[in-house]
Amino acid sequence: LSADQISTVQASFDKVKGDPVGILYAVFKADPSIMAKFTQFAGKDLESIKGTAPFETHANRIVGFFSKIIGELPNIEADVNTFVASHKPRGVTHDQLNNFRAGFVSYMKAHTDFAGAEAAWGATLDTFFGMIFSKM
C-alpha cells in the first residue's frame, strides 16, 4: 500500500468510525449468517437488537479492532494473526468474510464520499483479506 492510499483510507474511516452500531448493522443486514455466528445474537431479529447495549458493546469491539488495523497500516501482520486466531476456530468462512467486506463497503458508500477513496479501500481490503485468507 502506498502512503497516499493509507492516508486516504484513514481519512475516510475517520468519518465513520464514530458509528459502530451503524457499521455492524450494515454488515449483519448484508449477511444474517454473520450475525448467527454470535451466540448472543443468533436467532434474534436484527431490528430489535440494533439499539441494545449488547449490540452496541459488540459493535464498539469490532469497529475498535478495525480502527486499530486502519491506524497501523501497513503493519497489520499481528492484527491479522489475532483475527485468524479468534475467527478460524469458530468456522468463519471466506464467503462470510467477503460478505462482511461487501456490507462494510456498502455502508461506506452510503456514508462517505467513497468514490474518491474506492481504489485505496480496494487495495487495503484486498491486502487485509488476502492475508487472512492465506491463513484460514
Swiss-Prot record:
One term under GO cellular component: hemoglobin complex
Recorded GO MF terms: heme binding; metal ion binding; oxygen binding; oxygen carrier activity
Pfam families in the record: Globin
Key words of the record: Heme, Iron, Metal-binding, Oxygen transport, Transport
Annotated ranges, domain Globin: 1-136
InterPro entries: Erythrocruorin, Globin, Globin-like_sf, Globin/Proto, Mb-like_M
PROSITE patterns referenced in this protein's UniProt entry, alphabetically: GLOBIN
Binding, heme b: 87
Quaternary structure, from the entry: Monomer.
Note, other: There are at least 12 different components in Midge globin.
Family per record: Belongs to the globin family.
Name this polypeptide is given: Globin CTP-III
